[in-house]
Amino acid sequence: QATILSLIPRAKSSTQNLADIAAMGAEPVTLVVSLSMPAHTTYGWVEDFARGISDSIVACGAHSCTVSGGDLGTSNDITVSITAMGRMHPNTPKPVLRSGAQAGDTVAFAGQVGWADAGLRLLLQSHNPYLADITTKQTTGKRPRCDDNAVQRALTAQLRPTSPVPAGVLAARAGATAMLDVSDGLLKDAERIAYASAVDISLSAEAIEALSKPLVPLAQAILHGQPRNEDADSYVSLAQECVLGGGEDHGLLACFPSGALLPEGFVALGSCLVPEGQQPRVLLGQRQAQARGWEHYQPL
């Protein structure tokens, strides 16, 4: 079983770029990597970083992708910049954008969502007994019941995320009208498709509940030691918050024509509707969902 120390993040920069290519229905073919670092950076760190990129390519299923070059430089801080390039297949020559969804389309998702956020919340709690257990392999007092594999999955999702890259090509072949990788939160990225395509997006409450259910025991672990929040409703609420507002899982959110057979790996989450107001909305059930997720240029 891996420890937290062995899960040092080394694959995130490549995974997020591979996901961007997949979200346009393309196949990643090469990465160009630029790395600037202080002169005292150890060779072992650089080797581990390079291995992480290679591992990420394999874990994401981007089997035709290579690292074709890049640049090295000296700087006060470590800076990583990766450019990914991909190719469209002959039978799907046009990239899938976020702006092509139509009213009546099915909204579907491939990958995992909410797990990276749960992992981050665990990592931000240095006092959490689960972290001590995984680091020292010792049990540290009474803790809520939770599968250690679920904790490990959440930590791995945050520190070494993967994206279902082959699903992007499958989606394009199946006629996807719009697609985006979920890096900033399911609601936030659904909202981006809604705005770009001028549609309302209605997410099924039942589908969100199904995605949230496996995270409820983790929510209990995260809230452990916070008595005011320790009730079943709080656990469910936090699990749904991870699914709806958490980012960095890099799953694929796509829209397909009504009645289309969803490609392997995708599950239906809802549908696109004719917008009722002046601005497109994302609905959860019958109610407008409050905006959640990461906004890069929003003042802190």
Label each residue range with its predicted role.
Residues 1-4, 31-40:
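Glycine-/proline-rich flexible loop or hinge segments
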Residues 1-24:
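Active-site cofactor/substrate anionic-group-binding motifs, chiefly glycine-
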Residues 5, 39-66, 73-80, 85, ...:
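Glycine-/charge-enriched secondary-structure boundary and capping motifs
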Residues 14, 120-123, 171, 189-193:
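Buried hydrophobic packing segments
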Residues 17, 25, 67, 104, ...:
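Residue-level signal for inorganic ion chemistry
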Residues 24-34, 67-70:
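Short beta-strand segments at enzyme active-site cores
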Residues 68, 108-110, 202:
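Structural detector of well-ordered beta-strand residues that form the stable sheet scaffold
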Residues 95-169:
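Short, acidic (Asp/Glu-rich) active-site segment that either coordinates a divalent metal cofactor
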